[in-house]
């Protein structure tokens, strides 16, 4: 039912003509219905949760150095536009930029052989993740300790300004170029609208 739909138009067009067509060919066939589609905040954990999942490996593979460790934190909501952008930049500066401090700390500690990060801001409550690949399950406590000690040190002493500037420049270039590879630009703009529009109908353009 269109009462529970989101419609966006992209491109150089006669907007009045397109809106009239939508009304005549589609929307006018329906009565407006109230829809309660509000997504509520998840109740926060009182303590850190540990989740263990198994995955298949080949019979000739060893379980040694074949564990994935993941550290995940909820970061406010996607309606906080400053944090939304800040964590996109921090994700790059901490885990992707040359000499990224969090990545370097984990590699220097020998916790895994490949370190990556992600900031999933396509959900109401974005999730910042640090992932260690080719680690071992007995390293999980050290994994958490290194992450938290490194972040506390960065909070106390500051982050490398060059890394932070590189993150800002990287995202500025990406925004200016609006290059989405093989994906149509209009489609990607629409998907980005949903990062906030789904949770507050008055804020479709904050990102």
Predicted region positions:
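Charge-rich, well-structured scaffold segments of protease-associated domains
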Residues: 1-47, 59-87, 92-207
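Short amphipathic
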Residues: 49-57
